Structure formats: C-alpha cells, structure tokens
C-alpha cells in the first residue's frame, strides 16, 4: 500500500465515523416527544406542593394510585390550563435548543475523534510504508467446522 492508499483509508474511516454520528444524532434529534408529557410533569410538580393533594394521595394508598393521579392531573389541567400551556411552549423551545446544542457538541466530538483516528491510521501506515514492509491484510482463515479434518 502506498502513502496515497493510506490517506484514502484514513479519509474513508473519518468520513464513516462522522456520517455515522450525524445520522444517529439526526434520528435522535427528529424524535418528537409524546404529547402532553411535559404538561403531566408540570402538573405533578405543582400537585406535589399542595397539602390537600398529598393528603388524598396518602389516604388512597398504592392500590388506586394510578387512577387517582390521573384524575388529579386532569382536574388540575382543567383548572390551570393557561399557565401550563405557556409553560409547555417555553419547555418546547428550551428542549429544542438543548437538542440542537447536544447535536452540535456530538458533531464536534465526532469530528475530533475522526481526526485522531485518521491521524493514527496515517502515522502507522506511513511508518510501515517507509520501513519498506508490505501493508497487506491478514489472510482469512475459516473457523473449523464439523466437516473439517482438523477436529
């Protein structure tokens, strides 16, 4: 393999690393949230501070907890929907910004890792080419099977 081959190999590995991370982050970025998840979380946070709600929850016990929570949340949402809708819009903007920041950060990390990986490949390959050794892949040996005479 020549130095040109080493450069092509390093460039290919770098490109594969960066494209893989971009595709993975693009999929993660495009996934939306379930509708109303943050509204329920906000309602639960507001309900946790209410002594009446805490008392009703402790009286109910664990058996009817899910149904009681659902009823309390729906009741709370029906009474305080305007503030929660505004908070939901703010939450959505913050979440979108955070996803974008994570995407950019991971893209920079992928570029950095791709650079160092290509540098290691180029350095190792160039040393081998310079020393005059052949750079060739190792021969592929099939694993022994039941029909193999070596078993």
Swiss-Prot record:
GO terms for cellular component: membrane. The keyword DNA-binding does not apply. Keywords: Membrane, Transmembrane, Transmembrane helix. The keyword Transport does not apply. It comes from Ictalurid herpesvirus 1 (strain Auburn) (IcHV-1). It is found in: Membrane. The chain crosses the membrane at residues 7-23, 107-123. It is a multi-pass membrane protein. This is Putative membrane protein ORF10.
